Curated annotation (Swiss-Prot):
Enzyme Commission numbers on file: 2.1.1.-
Entry-linked InterPro entries: Ribosomal_L11_MeTrfase_PrmA (IPR050078), Ribosomal_PrmA_MeTrfase (IPR004498), SAM-dependent_MTases_sf (IPR029063)
Top enzyme category: transferase
Family: Belongs to the methyltransferase superfamily. PrmA family.
A Gene Ontology molecular function term of the record: protein-lysine N-methyltransferase activity
NCBIfam families: prmA
Keywords per UniProt: Cytoplasm, Methyltransferase, S-adenosyl-L-methionine, Transferase
Name this protein carries in UniProt: Ribosomal protein L11 methyltransferase
Pfam families attached to this UniProt entry: PrmA
Reactions accelerated catalytically: L-lysyl-[protein] + 3 S-adenosyl-L-methionine = N(6),N(6),N(6)-trimethyl-L-lysyl-[protein] + 3 S-adenosyl-L-homocysteine + 3 H(+)
Matching PANTHER family: ELECTRON TRANSFER FLAVOPROTEIN BETA SUBUNIT LYSINE METHYLTRANSFERASE (PTHR43648:SF1)
Residue sites binding S-adenosyl-L-methionine per the record: T144, G165, D187, N229
Species of origin: Saccharophagus degradans (strain 2-40 / ATCC 43961 / DSM 17024)
Length: 292
């Protein structure tokens, strides 16, 4: 069935209360978006990320009365809101739409990320199979692509790896398929840990070949290589822990970082890491280095 979208432009101060009002009025989901092509950087811990001009989009079932629902939103908010728009959102099988547009991605001369329902373009290459129903990282985002591209250029045979913030497990699985001796996945999201292990099995790996942990239970023993594709804020906060996980002479690859955030990352790591490479794609960067 189709859905109705209610779009309201608000200030950052109004956004939390308007979001609550929309949910109280029966919205099935509410999202906050930049309404001015303005990039958003990570807020301080405990803060809500908001732009100076924020669009709230609330999703309602199609059989509601738009006039009555809008009145409910305003009543819950407690005062009159600015101009709003209603839009009809045609129902689609969104996973099918995503599948239609997801194609194999080449991340190195002999390394591909392939949808699990398609035949690999190069059967003789290393082909990592992913399923969109479980994918927290698919290789399509610049940060994931740059990490994979870097990893494909490393000799990882017999190395021990940690994929910190593993998501779909794409980086750790790639390392294992390239010959790493072992990999460990770490993530704060239990669903990501499940996705990682199911994707490992999909690629012919036993679950025990890629054990996964919440951060507080993760092994602390240093390894040969740490891969962390998260965000700049957490990377800075986790710098002491991530540095401690790398053996002396081992390698670290960091991404999820905007070009404008390069200095903060380097400042947090340069006392212990000699950065040897910075990759750039769109507005994102990937930094790799060696532990001193």
């Amino acid at each position: 069935m189709p859905w109705l979208q209610l779009r309201i432009n608000v200030t950052p101060e109004q956004a939390p209360a308007v979001e609550s009002a929309a949910l109280a009025a029966g919205a099935q989901a509410v999202t906050l978006e930049d309404n001015a092509d303005q990039p958003i950087f990570e807020p301080a811990l405990g803060e809500t990320p908001l732009w100076s001009d924020t669009r709230i989009t609330a999703l309602f079932e199609a059989d509601i009365s738009t006039d009555e629902t809008w009145q409910k939103v305003q009543n819950h908010y407690g005062e009159e809101l600015p101009h709003h728009h209603w839009h009809v959102l045609e129902d689609k099988d969104w996973e099918r739409e995503w599948i239609k547009n997801y194609h194999p991605i080449q991340c190195g001369p002999h390394f591909w990320i392939c949808p699990s329902w398609l035949s690999p373009p190069d059967p003789n290459a290393i082909n990592l199979l992913l399923d969109p129903g479980l994918a927290f990282g698919t290789g399509t985002h610049p940060t994931t692509f740059m990490c994979l591209e870097w990893l494909a250029q490393q000799d990882v045979k017999n190395l021990e790896l940690i994929d910190y913030g593993c998501g779909s497990g794409i980086l750790g699985i790639a390392g294992l398929l390239m010959g790493a001796n072992s990999a460990v996945g770490v993530d704060i999201d239990p669903q990501a840990l499940l996705a990682t292990q199911e994707n490992a099995v999909r690629n012919g790996l036993a679950k025990e070949a890629f054990p996964v942990f919440m951060p507080q239970r993760a092994p602390k023993e240093p390894v040969d290589m740490v891969l962390a594709n998260i965000l700049a804020g957490p990377l800075v906060e986790l710098a002491p822990a991530l540095i401690a996980l790398v053996k002396s002479g081992g390698k670290i690859c960091l991404s999820g970082v905007l070009g404008t955030q390069r200095t903060s990352i380097i400042s947090a790591y340069e006392h212990a890491i000699e950065f040897t490479e910075v990759r750039e794609k769109d507005e994102w960067i990937c930094l790799a280095g060696i532990k001193k």
